[in-house]
Structure formats: structure tokens, C-alpha cells
A protein has these predicted regions:
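Transmembrane-helix boundary and interhelical linker motifs in polytopic inner-membrane proteins
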Residues: 1-2, 18-58, 75-81, 114-121, ...
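Alpha-helical transmembrane segments of multi-pass membrane transporters
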Residues: 124-147, 161-166
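Interfacial/gating helices of multi-pass transporter permease domains
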Residues: 1-17, 48, 148-153, 187
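Membrane-interface junctions at transmembrane-helix termini in multi-pass inner-membrane proteins
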Residues: 98-126, 139, 149, 170-173
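Small-residue-rich midsections of specific transmembrane alpha-helices
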Residues: 9-37, 56-63, 100-106, 162-165
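Alpha-helical transmembrane segments of multi-pass membrane proteins
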Residues: 82-106, 135, 152, 160-161
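Short membrane-interface helical motifs at transmembrane helix boundaries
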Residues: 64-83
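Interhelical loop/hinge segments that connect adjacent transmembrane helices in multipass membrane
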Residues: 148-154, 166-187
């Protein structure tokens, strides 16, 4: 109901307000990758990609730790959440945090796809993401469980699927971006 909508908006909002970071990180990572792609130096490109992956893993870890410390405190002590929905609010926070972490670690793979101008892949994954979110919204109508928690679980799963699609595509199709590095010539 109305309370659940408000809880989701506030709790997930604590995490998603940092979503602007993903756009900025993706744009800058894409620029570095595209620049090195233009140099046609596969070693430099691989180093740049590996560095981007490592930086984003570190950012994800630090964000996770900070959110666990500050976010949980805010939910349990600062926000005015009905007592009977506090457990659900904590679960929503955890699933929203998972969604956020997947978003961060997806950035280098998304940026590599864009840097290589594989817009068909980007569009396909975006369509899959949108369709899965539509299915998630429909499943809420039939859910015999706490819909607030179920929705946040579905969004976390969709975020994981989106990450996996980018990860698998990059690892299989963009040979210069394989982790660990392998010796390949530029396409």
C-alpha cells in the first residue's frame, strides 16, 4: 500500500541517490577505453580495462561497507518507519544495496560495449532489462508474499542478470577486455 511505497522510496532512495556516480563513472571509463582503442595498443587497452575493473570493484566494496554502516543506522534509528515494517525496510535496503553494487561493477563492461560501438548489444541488454522489470511489476500482482521485499528481490536479480549479460558478452566477444589478460590482436 501507501506505506510500502513510501518505505521503498525512502529506503531505496538512500542507495539510488548515489546512482549519478554510475553515469559519471561509465562516461569517464568509456572515454579512456575509446581513447586507448583509437591508439590500437591492445596492451594499453587491456591495462586500462583491468584498472577500471579493479577501481570499480574497490568503489563497490567501499560503498557497500559505508552503506552498511551508515544506511542501516539511518533506517533503524533516524527514519520514522512503522515498527511492523522495519524488518521489511531492512530487507529492502539490503536488496537495494545489492542492486547498487551490481550497477557499480557493471560499469567497465557497459563502457567497453559502448567504446566498441556495439550498440546492438547495448540495445538488446537494455530491452531485456526493461522487459524483466515489466515482468517483475506484473509478478507483484500475483505475489503471495510481502510485495515490498519481493519487488526489491526481483530488482536485485534483474540487476545481476544485466551485469552477467554485459560480463559474458565482453569476456566472449571483446578479446582485449578478457580478465585475466590473454594475448590477442586488436579486432
Amino acid at each position: 500500500g501507501i506505506d510500502d511505497y513510501g518505505i521503498y522510496g525512502v529506503v531505496a532512495g538512500l542507495i539510488t541517490m548515489f546512482g549519478f556516480m554510475n553515469a559519471a563513472m561509465s562516461s569517464s571509463t568509456q572515454r579512456y577505453l575509446a581513447f586507448n582503442l583509437g591508439l590500437k595498443d591492445s596492451i594499453k587497452l587491456q591495462q586500462t580495462f583491468t584498472t577500471a575493473v579493479n577501481i570499480h570493484l574497490l568503489i563497490a566494496l567501499l560503498s557497500f561497507l559505508l552503506a552498511e554502516a551508515v544506511g542501516l543506522w539511518a533506517i533503524n534509528h533516524l527514519l520514522d518507519i512503522p515498527t511492523d515494517r522495519l524488518v521489511a525496510a531492512n530487507k529492502v535496503f539490503q536488496y537495494s544495496l545489492i542492486t547498487f553494487v551490481f550497477g557499480i561493477i557493471q560499469v567497465p563492461y557497459h563502457a567497453a560495449t559502448i567504446a566498441y560501438e556495439r550498440m546492438n548489444v547495448y540495445a538488446s541488454i537494455s530491452i531485456v532489462d526493461a522487459v524483466l522489470k515489466l515482468i517483475a511489476a506484473y509478478l507483484l500482482l500475483m505475489a503471495p508474499v510481502d510485495r515490498l521485499v519481493f519487488y526489491s528481490q526481483l530488482l536485485a536479480a534483474i540487476s545481476g542478470i544485466s551485469f552477467l549479460l554485459y560480463f559474458v558478452y565482453v569476456q566472449l566477444q571483446l578479446k582485449e577486455m578478457v580478465i585475466p589478460p590473454q594475448n590477442h590482436s586488436m579486432n
